[in-house]
Amino acid sequence: MSLRPMMRNDNASRMLGMVVEHDAPGESRVSMTVRDDMLNGFAITHGGLVFTLADTAFAIACNEDERVTVAGGADITFLKSTTAGQTLTATAARRARSGRTGLYDIRVTDETGDLVAEVRGRSITTDRRPPAPVAEPVEAPGPRALHDPAPERDEALTTTEVYR
C-alpha cells in the first residue's frame, strides 16, 4: 500500500485514529474506531466525525496523480447512529472523472456492514503539487475537553493565526 504524501502529513486523521486499509487510484477504504470523546450530546457519534472519516477516504481516492485534488463540494445522508466502541469504515469509489472535475461515492458502514451514511463528493484538480512529506509526522495533540476554557489573549486571533 502506498500512502499518498498528503496522508503522511495528515495530523487530523492521525489524531482521530484513522487507518488506511486500501489505497488505489480512484478508490480507498479507511476505518476508525469511535471513542467516547467522539460522541455528541446524545451519546452517539458526532455527525461531523462521520463526515470527516468519509472525507478522508474521498481525499485519498481523488488524489490519483501528482496534482493536488480538493473537494469542490459534498453531500451526506445519515442513515444510522453509532456509538463508542464501534468501528466505522468509509469506502470511496470514483464514479466519473472529466478534465479537472470528479465525482465520488463514499459509503460509511459499521462493523456489521450496516450502512451508516452515504456521501457524494465532487472534486477539483489543481495545478499544485503535493507538499513534500515531513520527515517525522507531527504528533497531533489529544482532544481538549469542551468545557476547558480557551487560553486567555489580550487580542483577537488574526486570520493568519486561525489558519496556521
Which residues make up each language-model segment?
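Terminal targeting signals and extreme-terminal segments of soluble enzymes
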Residues: 1-138, 142-164
